[in-house]
Amino acid sequence: MTTLTDLAGWLAMEPAGDDVKAVVTVIAGACAQISKVVASGAISGSLGAAGQVNVQDEEQKKLDIITNDILRGALKACGPVAGLASEELEEIETTGREGGFLVTFDPLDGSSNIDVNVSVGTIFSILPAPATGIPTEADFLQPGRQQVAAGYAVYGPQTMLVLTLSKGVAGFTLDADGAWRLTHGDVAIPADTAEFAINMSNQRHWAQPVRRYIDGCLQGKSGPRGKNFNMRWVASMVADVHRIAMRGGIFMYPWDAREPDKPGKLRLLYEANPMSLIVERAGGKSTLDGVTAILDVQPTKLHQRVPVVLGSANEVDQVAAG
């Protein structure tokens, strides 16, 4: 059997700097550890609610706390990391070091699904830290285009790690010995698709462009799109976006009228920015509304939320045209 390139071998061929490679290696190790914890959840008694809420006012699962602590510990011990911010924590944490990188992460995306054994994941973003001085919250408020690397791990039938550093997107599968093996050397999202992912139960609350787009998809061959579409919805961003990375599609978590003063649901720094970098580098588009690129958004606060429309480029354009 052919031996597949491992993560270290792939990183050695990447033109990115050694320090960012070190950070990626540490995060990959933490994700491998999280994979084991997630897989043994019911056996180890780590499923279920933790009996508290996070900064997002969401009920925390036990695994939210466990996975958050795994990543925090790994990153604090990583020399090039000057600071970190987690979806689960109200404030940033610093390491006492200057220069290097800042890391933002969602330790367990889709954790509401964990008790029913649906795929969940970890999402992360690596940003440049200021050259001197201990980082402050303001240093994390960088547009997504300033990310030096981003990635996610998805814990499903296989555990996969999808990364972008200097260019392109690559996917790795965790083998039985705990090594990340390169299984998807050039992830590319096709421009056209016949699948959409959206929570249809909120249809009555959407803005007109989103309604028109989905109505066109639902009309199938007899409608304006002239082809049939399938709907997919896991309610785990990492799982839905991973499917799109592997075979195309469009993922939509749009603004809706239930809370009109809130711009969206997904977190810009922990979810939308890293996923947008991956999607764009794989040939797709990632926007707020079909028009405005998420990577161009200037963050104004640590836990800022945004609407998301991303995936196959021509489908995202169709939303804008609606």
Swiss-Prot record:
Cystine connections: none
NCBIfam families: PRK09293.1-3, PRK09293.1-4
Positions with a binding annotation for Mg(2+) 2: 106, 109, 271
Organism per entry: Caulobacter sp. (strain K31)
Family label: Belongs to the FBPase class 1 family.
PROSITE patterns per record: FBPASE
Main location: cytoplasm
Binding site for Mg(2+) 1: 87, 106, 108
Lineage: Bacteria, Pseudomonadati, Pseudomonadota, Alphaproteobacteria, Caulobacterales
Reaction(s) the record says it catalyses: beta-D-fructose 1,6-bisphosphate + H2O = beta-D-fructose 6-phosphate + phosphate
One BP annotation, GO: fructose 6-phosphate metabolic process
Cofactor(s) needed: Mg(2+)
Enzyme nomenclature, EC number: 3.1.3.11
This protein's name: Fructose-1,6-bisphosphatase class 1
One GO CC term on file: cytosol
SUPFAM superfamilies for the chain: Carbohydrate phosphatase
